[in-house]
């Protein structure tokens, strides 16, 4: 039973705190006070006043940039906003390489797109840029931006091969799998319709080991240049995605069963943390479905685990999955509508079990190295058919490594309809079990792909209906987490956004809640080459801000550069403002005779 053997390796050595208690923990945890200021000394240490942040002051926003860098930024962002050029950018790159030769082509790219969006070719060559950014208050999240250059056909073949089990290939697997959690040829190339997110395709276990080594080098490099660094990882880089698909389906169906029982008990439409099932009624339903005997059911729901409330919430129900499902023998999930237990697969092969265990071991190696180097590990969100498993495995790492402070950060995609439920459930779980909550909030990178897949395959669109609804969801999630930070001195969050309104909202709520930037508990993040008018004013005002910094050889990061160009096309409103500010600063330097400005 691979899951039951492997997950304990990610559990902390300290005792778990009442994993099935339905009594909500008090929100009143130690508040963040003056003593929380790094290096602040006594509890009566006085924080410095918070400087005002002006995102419209072009002179301050770009005082770290030389004039030729401003001109390059203006050129690149203008080209990225030219639809006709973007539509043919791959052909233009190919022709340029043929006409110029490799050496001149590399120079051209370093003078333009590569120089704007990529820090350098290796960890040594990027050091001057990292030091320069730190001098102006901006830190780095390192990412080795090299991608495998696969044709669409090669990507589709790899995806279908790695997401389909041996049992499904030979016809012995069940046909009752949820189609949302099955691989489909039409969406085999996961790069389609995706911007800003790197895509990994499974080749073999050796390739996964290679990805792990790359992440380890990033951790070491980040630890050398900063005592407050981050790196981002993707779990699809660390193992066969078949496991993520199947485990996601288990978790989704387990959660769906809980909500179906909630409907039966007249609690439809309630928020996740407000739904409380009567245990006696739930026991009756479980017994009728034949999921377990009466004796087993009574063993599940005891006074010791449930306390005196007589009710069970979604966290309590989810915690049962460790011991009630057997992934490697005969995994069954209850279907309340049919009244049947549905097997997902007959069994994992020995090789599949080993591959799953290796994925978890690689995660553990990275988390231990990050802990050793004092670097925070952000686990990136991915497609919704992988995400339940990714979030659950991240949670297991948080239980083990977030004991004293948040070293492992989960990512929450706020374009999802269930984003708020996901955030509130995890915050409450951290409270109950006593570990430190760490989160990165993003809008999401897979919108077009997710919508197209849901429409084509035939399941509910998981994405919020409008851009405004996504903004509202982001602010709702952020507000909830900031409220938690007010009462919990060990929780932290990264506001990963290029939206000025969202950043202003975060700053206003921080001021209202008494969250000082010197506490280093609210971080801000943007991509290298984008929204410097947000990043540098924040950094210069003392807020902890990070640039997502890719690096790698020119030819091997071209797929990354293609996405950066396409992303700027999709963010026309934001880049228009950025181009305006760049023009203002260039004209100011021209008028004042300061074209040879030296950053200081």
UniProtKB/Swiss-Prot annotation:
Pathway(s): Amino-acid degradation; L-proline degradation into L-glutamate; L-glutamate from L-proline: step 1/2
Free-text tissue specificity from the UniProt record: Expressed in lung, skeletal muscle and brain, to a lesser extent in heart and kidney, and weakly in liver, placenta and pancreas.
Catalytic reactions on record: L-proline + a quinone = (S)-1-pyrroline-5-carboxylate + a quinol + H(+)
Effect of residue 185 to R: Increased proline dehydrogenase activity
Record keywords: Acetylation, Disease variant, FAD, Flavoprotein, Mitochondrion, Oxidoreductase, Proline metabolism, Schizophrenia, Transit peptide
Disulphides: none
GO aspect biological process, one term: 4-hydroxyproline catabolic process
InterPro entries: FAD-linked_oxidoreductase-like, Proline_DH_dom, Proline_oxidase
Induction: During p53/TP53-induced apoptosis.
Enzyme class per UniProt: oxidoreductase
Chain residue ranges for the region called Disordered: 155-177
Documented effect of changing residue 441 to P: In HYRPRO1; uncertain significance; probable risk factor for SCZD4; strongly reduced enzymatic activity
Assigned GO CC terms: intracellular membrane-bounded organelle; mitochondrial inner membrane; mitochondrial matrix; mitochondrion; nucleoplasm
UniProt-listed Enzyme Commission number(s): 1.5.5.2
Modified residues (N6-acetyllysine): 368, 486
SUPFAM superfamilies: FAD-linked oxidoreductase
Assigned protein family: Belongs to the proline oxidase family.
PANTHER family, sorted: PROLINE DEHYDROGENASE 1, MITOCHONDRIAL, PROLINE OXIDASE
Name assigned to this protein: Proline dehydrogenase 1, mitochondrial
Gene of this entry: PRODH
């Amino acid at each position: 039973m691979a899951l039951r053997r492997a997950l304990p390796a990610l559990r902390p050595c300290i005792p778990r705190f009442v994993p099935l208690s339905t009594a909500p923990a008090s929100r009143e945890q130690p508040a963040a006070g003056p003593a929380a200021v790094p290096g602040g000394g006594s509890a009566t240490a006085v924080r410095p006043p918070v400087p005002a942040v002006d995102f419209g002051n072009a002179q301050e926003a770009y005082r770290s940039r030389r004039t030729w860098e401003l001109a390059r930024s203006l050129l690149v962002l203008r080209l990225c906003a030219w639809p006709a050029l973007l539509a043919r950018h791959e052909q233009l790159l190919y022709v340029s390489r043929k006409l110029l030769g490799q050496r001149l082509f590399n120079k051209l790219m370093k003078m333009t797109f590569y120089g704007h969006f990529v820090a350098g070719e290796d960890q040594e060559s990027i050091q001057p840029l990292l030091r320069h950014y730190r001098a102006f208050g901006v830190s780095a999240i390192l990412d080795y931006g090299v991608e495998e250059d696969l044709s669409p056909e090669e990507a589709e073949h790899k995806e279908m091969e790695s997401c389909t089990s041996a049992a499904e290939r030979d016809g012995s697997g069940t046909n009752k799998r949820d189609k949302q959690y099955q691989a489909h040829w039409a969406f085999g190339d996961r790069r389609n319709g995706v911007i800003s997110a790197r895509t990994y395709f499974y080749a073999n276990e050796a390739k996964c080991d290679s990805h792990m080594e790359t992440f380890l080098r990033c951790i070491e490099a980040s630890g050398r240049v900063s005592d407050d660094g981050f790196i981002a990882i993707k779990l699809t880089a660390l193992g066969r995605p078949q496991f993520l698909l199947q485990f996601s389906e288990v978790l989704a169906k387990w959660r769906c069963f809980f909500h179906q029982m909630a409907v039966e008990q007249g609690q439809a439409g309630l928020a996740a943390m407000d739904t409380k099932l009567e245990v006696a009624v739930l026991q009756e339903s479980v017994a009728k479905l034949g999921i377990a005997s009466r004796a087993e059911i009574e063993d599940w729901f005891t006074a010791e685990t449930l306390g005196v409330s007589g009710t069970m919430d979604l966290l309590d129900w989810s915690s049962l999955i460790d011991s009630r499902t057997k992934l490697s023998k005969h995994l069954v999930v209850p279907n309340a509508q049919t009244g049947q237990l549905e097997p997902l697969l007959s069994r994992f092969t020995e090789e599949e079990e080993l591959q799953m265990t290796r994925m978890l071991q690689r995660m553990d190696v990275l988390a231990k190295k990050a802990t050793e180097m004092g670097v925070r590990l952000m686990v990136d969100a991915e497609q919704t058919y992988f995400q339940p498993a990714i979030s659950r495995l991240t949670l297991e790492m948080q239980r083990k490594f977030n004991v004293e402070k948040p070293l492992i950060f989960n990512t929450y995609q706020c374009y999802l309809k269930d984003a708020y439920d996901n955030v509130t459930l995890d915050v409450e779980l951290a409270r109950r079990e006593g570990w430190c909550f760490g989160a990165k909030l993003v809008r999401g990178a897979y919108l077009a792909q997710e919508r197209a897949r849901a429409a084509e395959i035939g399941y509910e669109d998981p994405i919020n209906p409008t851009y405004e609804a996504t903004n509202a969801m982001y602010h709702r999630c952020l507000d909830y987490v900031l409220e938690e930070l007010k009462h919990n001195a060990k929780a932290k969050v990264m506001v990963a956004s290029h939206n000025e309104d969202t950043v202003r909202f975060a700053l206003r709520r921080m001021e209202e809640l008494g969250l000082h930037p010197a506490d280093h508990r609210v971080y801000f993040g943007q991509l290298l080459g984008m929204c410097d008018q947000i990043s540098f004013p924040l950094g210069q005002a003392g807020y902890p801000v990070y640039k997502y910094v890719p690096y790698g050889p020119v030819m091997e990061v071209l797929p990354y550069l293609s996405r950066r160009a396409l992303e700027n096309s999709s963010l026309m409103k934001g880049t228009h403002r950025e181009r305006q500010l760049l023009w203002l600063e260039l004209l100011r330097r021209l008028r004042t005779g300061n074209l040879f400005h030296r950053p200081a």
